[in-house]
Amino acid sequence: MSPESKKLFNIIILGVAFMFMFTAFQTCGNVAQTVIRSLNSTDFHGSGYTSMAIIYGVFSASNLITPSVVAIVGPQLSMFASGLFYSMYIAVFIQPFPWSFYTASVFIGIAAAVLWTAQGNCLTINSDEHTIGRNSGIFWALLQSSLFFGNLYIYFAWQGKTQISESDRRTVFIALTVISLVGTVLFFLIRKPDSENVLGEDESSDDQDMEVNESAQNNLTKAVDAFKKSFKLCVTKEMLLLSITTAYTGLELTFFSGVYGTCIGAINKFGAEEKSLIGLSGIFIGIGEILGGSLFGLLSKNNRFGRNPVVLLGILVHFIAFYLIFLNMPGDAPIAPVKGTDSSAYIKSSKEVAILCSFLLGLGDSCFNTQLLSILGFLYSEDSAPAFAIFKFVQSICAAVAFFYSNYLLLHWQLLVMVIFGFFGTISFFTVEWEAAAFVARGSDYRSI
């Protein structure tokens, strides 16, 4: 297998492993609040929104140290260990208790920080300026396929149900736990690129032994250097501007992954299909994500206009979706009680419009995330772990804040917050992309996704 083929193989395995893990986790997140509402009529008392706020809050704080962890342990083992914690969190829903539910939320927050920093590092070392766009698109399309498979099962399994029984819950979460473990094991199929694991012609085995002996001493240096680089990158102009865009992706991630499905499941006017529509919504979010990732990956070699048109498409698609959601859903849908809401929207609530908005949310999200992955890999190819850690730090802290306020804010206020951040995030991304293009024009090669 040629070096380039091996790198492409690694990207595909990375995407497939994440597809399995997040088939389980994103399906879990999509139905968590609905499942917990059913559980709250028993001895269990908890909130899916609060759990997600804990996860993303711990996630954001943990990103400060994850570059050091990945530098010492390596991306492959980091992702495997993180996958075990993801599986543990999902397994908690088989027989949940408040203490285990919230404790697992803390652990998965730490694991998520390690996982995504390692993913960014793995993506970057298996790419160059020519392939980063293509590889970002391939990874994103495979990752977001997870939304399709898990939610397809939810749609058929929960069709016609207004309450989630104990048997239904256990069946779903046992299956999701197994799926997550399969993805975790797949990380062991990722190979080191030839440039990292093949000795040069002039390098003897004695030289290699010397490197092994020195590696323990170098680990501490690597950890400290990675920690310092994270703080230095935080205050660069480009990273500060991209942080506004990243903040928006955190807010809209919370909305489409947790809040929107809950809104659909709370609208009593949708009738007996309201719970199964949560699964259908997730499927169409996934279709939008897959379409976007695949399309931008295929166009990466031919797009001469840079990343900005894709981001512009993303914000326009999202603004259309937000407006339709504002018209189609009652304002109290995100915070409705277990019995749901009978409130009226500005128009007659339509299942078809709700599902269309799911597709638009997924498509717009893929526009932003593929371009952020691409530009980070391009600008910070030498400091990928710290750069992706900062990206996930900002994204996750905003997601945590959004999950927290989702317990209290009516729908139209949540939409307004996203519109404001989306507008300024788009402008800030444009600024960084223009500067990147100017830098390339002065002598470096350039490929946009």
Curated annotation (Swiss-Prot):
The modification Phosphoserine is found at S204. The lineage of its organism: Eukaryota, Metazoa, Chordata, Craniata, Vertebrata. It is found in: Membrane. The gene is MFSD11. It is a multi-pass membrane protein. PANTHER family: ET TRANSLATION PRODUCT-RELATED, UNC93-LIKE PROTEIN MFSD11. This is UNC93-like protein MFSD11. Belongs to the unc-93 family. InterPro entries: Ion_channel_UNC-93, MFS_trans_sf, UNC-93-like_regulator. Glycans are attached at N40. It holds the Pfam family UNC-93. The chain crosses the membrane at residues 8-28, 53-73, 74-94, 96-116, 138-158, 170-190, 239-259, 277-297, 309-329, 359-379, 385-405, 410-430. Keywords: Glycoprotein, Membrane, Phosphoprotein, Transmembrane, Transmembrane helix. Gene3D superfamilies: MFS general substrate transporter like domains (1.20.1250.20). Its main location: membrane. CDD domains: MFS_MFSD11 (cd17407). It comes from Macaca fascicularis. The keyword Phosphoprotein applies. GO terms for cellular component: membrane.
